[in-house]
A protein has these predicted regions:
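C-terminal subdomain of alpha/beta-hydrolase-fold enzymes, centered on the catalytic histidine
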Residues: 471-599
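Serine-dependent carboxylesterase/thioesterase catalytic core
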Residues: 88-89, 93-101, 105, 112-124, ...
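Bacterial N-terminal signal peptides
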Residues: 35-47
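Short amphipathic alpha-helix adjacent to the substrate-entry channel of hydrolases
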Residues: 327-343
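Flexible, membrane-associating and regulatory peripheral segments of lipid-active enzymes
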Residues: 49-313, 322-328, 344-347, 376, ...
Length: 599
C-alpha cells in the first residue's frame, strides 16, 4: 500500500474516532434524530411493530384489600381488619409501623383459623392470610431485612420475628427489599402465571453482588426472585415467630404443624419487574449503530440465581432487537409446572451491528466466561444448554453447534492464513473468528426464522443506507483494515469482497445472500451429535418452498436434518406466536427424557 493511501486511511480512522467520541455520551443528541427515525423504521420492518415493553404499576393496599372483600363476596371481621390495616399505610414511618403490626396480627389469626379448619382450601381465608403476611413483609425496614429479624408487639407481648430463606436457612436473607406481588399490576405479558395455595407471594429484590464471581452474569437491574412466605413456627409464649421464604418453583407442598399444604406462587411478577426496568428502546439503537455505547450491556445474563441442577435455556435475539422479544416465551417457561423446576432461562444480548462472525466469537467467549466463573466460584458446571436463536441470533446459534473447517476462510481468501501479512494479534483474531468447532456444552438447538442463506431484505435501499451509519469500535476497525484491506490482493475476487476491502461491512451487509458470510454459513453443517429444530414463518407465498415471513425466505430458513420443523403462518416475529411457544415447550419437555440428555 502506498504512503498516500496509508495517510488517507489514517485520516479517515481519526475522523471516525472523533465522530464516535462525539456521539451520544449520555444519550441521543438532537442532530441524530434522523438516525433514530431510521432505527424505528428498521425496527418496524424487522420486528413487525410487535410490542416488547413490560410495565409494572403498584396498586394501593386499600384497593387490593377492597378487591379481596369483593372477591370473597362477604365482609367478615377478618376482611374488615384487613381493610383497616390497609387504610393505615402511608408515608409516615410511625403509622406504617402500626400497619405492619396489624398485618402480622391478622396473618397470625388467619393462620390459626386455617390450621383449625378441616378444609384447608377456604379461598377467603387463604387470600387474607397471604396478603396480610405479604403486606407485613413489604413494610419491614431495610435494617430488619439486613439482619433477618424484627422486634414486634403481638397481643401486648414482645415477639422476635425471624426471617429465613429456604435456599440458605442458616443465614439471614440477602434480599434488599420484599414486594407483595399481588399489589403489582402487570402489562405487556400475555399471561400471568399464579399458582394458588398457601404463602405470601413475594418479589425479593437483590442488588447484583459485585464481589461474587458470577456478578457479571446477573441482570444489571436488581435481581428479582420469586418466593412464597409461610409461618414455619409460631410460639407466642416463647416470643418467637419464624417466617420461611420458599422457592415455589422447587416446592409445591410443604409440611407445617404435621399437615401438608400446597404452596402458591407468582411466577410472572419477578420477570415482569426485571423487564419493566430496562431501557431497550435506545439500547437496541445503540447496539446497531453505536456499538461502543452498548459494551456495558452485552453478555449472558441469568434471570434467577444460578442453579446447577437446572438446565440453561439460552435465548439469542436478532438484529435491532433485545431480550424483551423473548418475554412471553420466557414467561411461559417460568410459569410451566414442569419446566420451572427443570430449566433456568439465560438471555444473551449483544450489539447487533457487529459483523456476524465477530458476534459469534463474542458469544463463544461469553460461554467460556460462564464456565470459568463457575469453576472459580467453586460451583458445579452447568447442565447441557438448550440454545434458541431468532433471525440473526439463529445464525450465531448455528455457529455454536457447527464445524467451520475452511468453509468461511475460503470465501474470503485464496491462500492459507500463514501466507497473509498479519500481526500476531491479527492472527489470533482470525483464528477465533473464522475457525471454530461445535461446543460441547450445548445439547440441543432451536432456530427461528433464521436466514442461513441470507436475506434479500439486506439489499433494500433502506438497509443498505442504514449499514453506512454503523460505526465500529476503533479496535475492530483496525483489525478489519489490517486483515482485509492490507491483504486485498489475496482475497477471492468478487464484488462483495471488493466492498469488504474498501469498507468494513456491518451485519446488515453480510446478511445479503451474495455475501461471503451468507454463502459460507449456508454450507455449515450442524454437528450430528446435536439435535436441532426449525420454526419458520410462512405468511407470504403461493407454496411452502416459495413462501417467506416477509423478511426471510423459507428456502433460507430451511436446514436439512432437523429433528422437527414447525411452519407457522405468521411474519418474522414468529417468536410472539402462541404456536411457537407451544412448540418450544414441547421440545424442552422432550429434552428432559433420559435418552435426550447429556453432552
Amino acid at each position: 500500500m502506498s504512503s498516500s493511501a496509508g495517510q488517507r486511511w489514517e485520516k479517515k480512522r481519526i475522523e471516525a474516532k472523533q465522530r464516535k467520541q462525539a456521539a451520544f455520551p449520555s444519550g441521543p443528541a438532537v442532530s441524530d434524530r434522523g438516525s433514530i427515525l431510521l432505527c424505528l423504521m428498521l425496527s418496524a420492518v424487522c420486528q413487525g411493530c410487535a410490542p416488547t415493553d413490560i410495565h409494572v404499576h403498584p396498586k394501593s393496599a386499600i384497593s387490593e384489600a377492597s378487591r379481596t372483600i369483593q372477591k370473597s363476596g362477604q365482609r367478615t371481621r377478618l376482611t374488615s381488619e384487613f381493610l383497616e390495616a390497609a387504610k393505615l399505610e402511608g408515608n409516615n414511618s410511625a403509622v406504617n409501623r402500626v400497619a405492619e403490626q396489624r398485618y402480622l396480627k391478622l396473618a397470625l389469626d388467619v393462620w390459626a383459623a386455617l390450621r383449625a379448619a378441616k378444609d384447608q382450601s377456604d379461598p377467603t381465608l387463604l387470600e387474607i392470610h397471604n396478603q396480610a403476611l405479604a403486606n407485613y413483609l413489604q413494610l419491614l425496614s431495610p435494617g430488619d431485612l439486613a439482619i433477618g429479624t424484627a422486634d414486634e408487639i403481638v397481643d401486648g407481648r414482645r415477639v422476635l420475628v425471624v426471617l429465613r430463606d429456604d435456599a440458605k436457612p442458616d443465614h439471614p436473607p440477602t434480599f434488599d427489599q420484599l414486594i407483595a406481588a399481588e399489589r403489582l399490576r402487570i402489562r405487556g405479558l400475555r399471561e400471568r402465571y399464579v399458582r394458588p395455595g398457601l404463602g405470601a407471594r413475594m418479589i425479593c429484590q437483590q442488588e447484583p453482588d459485585r464481589i461474587s464471581a458470577l456478578s457479571r452474569y446477573t441482570v444489571p437491574e436488581k435481581q428479582q426472585v420469586a418466593r412464597s412466605a409461610v409461618f414455619k413456627a409460631v410460639s407466642l409464649p416463647q416470643g418467637r415467630i419464624e417466617i420461611l421464604l420458599v422457592d415455589p418453583s422447587k416446592t409445591e407442598r410443604i409440611k407445617l404443624d404435621g399437615r401438608f399444604w400446597g404452596v402458591g406462587g407468582d411466577f410472572s411478577a419477578p420477570f415482569a419487574a426485571i423487564g419493566s426496568r430496562t431501557r431497550f428502546i435506545f439500547q437496541r439503537w445503540q447496539g446497531l449503530f453505536r456499538m461502543e455505547h452498548y459494551a456495558n450491556r452485552q453478555g449472558i445474563f441469568f434471570l434467577e440465581p444460578y442453579d446447577p441442577e437446572k438446565i440453561p435455556v439460552l435465548m439469542v435475539h436478532g438484529i435491532l432487537s433485545s431480550p424483551l422479544m423473548w418475554k412471553d416465551l420466557t414467561n411461559r417457561i417460568m410459569g410451566d409446572p414442569v419446566l420451572q423446576r427443570k430449566y433456568q432461562v439465560w438471555h444473551y444480548t449483544y450489539a447487533t451491528g457487529f459483523p456476524i462472525l465477530t458476534s459469534a466469537r463474542m458469544l463463544r467467549e461469553q460461554l467460556d466466561g460462564v464456565n470459568i466463573a463457575l469453576q472459580r466460584a467453586g460451583l458445579p458446571p452447568h447442565q447441557p444448554i438448550v440454545l434458541i436463536g431468532h433471525s440473526l441470533g439463529g445464525l450465531l446459534a448455528k455457529m455454536m453447534v457447527s464445524d467451520s473447517h475452511d468453509l468461511i476462510w475460503n470465501q474470503f481468501f485464496r491462500v492459507p492464513p500463514d501466507q497473509l501479512n498479519l500481526t500476531p494479534a491479527d492472527k489470533d483474531w482470525v483464528d477465533h473468528v473464522m475457525f471454530f468447532e461445535p461446543r460441547h456444552d450445548i445439547s440441543r438447538a432451536i432456530f427461528m426464522a433464521s436466514p442461513f442463506k441470507g436475506s434479500k431484505t439486506a439489499d433494500l435501499i433502506l438497509f443498505r443506507f442504514s449499514s453506512r451509519l454503523v460505526r465500529f469500535p476503533t479496535e475492530l476497525e483496525e483489525h478489519l483494515y489490517r486483515v482485509f484491506t492490507r491483504n486485498r490482493s489475496y482475497m477471492v475476487n468478487s464484488k462483495e469482497n471488493r466492498l469488504i476491502a474498501k469498507r468494513q461491512p456491518s451485519s446488515i451487509d453480510l446478511l445479503a445472500p451474495e455475501s461471503p458470510e451468507s454463502i459460507a454459513l449456508g454450507q455449515l453443517k450442524v454437528a450430528r451429535s446435536i439435535p436441532f429444530h426449525l420454526i419458520i414463518g410462512v405468511r407470504h407465498g403461493s407454496s411452502l418452498t416459495r413462501s417467506s415471513d416477509g423478511i426471510v425466505a423459507y428456502s433460507s430458513s430451511y436446514l436439512a436434518g432437523a429433528e422437527s420443523e414447525l411452519d407457522v403462518p405468521t411474519g418474522h416475529t414468529v417468536t410472539h406466536s402462541p404456536k411457537t411457544e407451544e412448540e418450544v415447550l414441547r421440545i424442552l419437555k422432550l429434552n428432559l427424557q433420559p435418552k435426550n440428555r447429556g453432552f
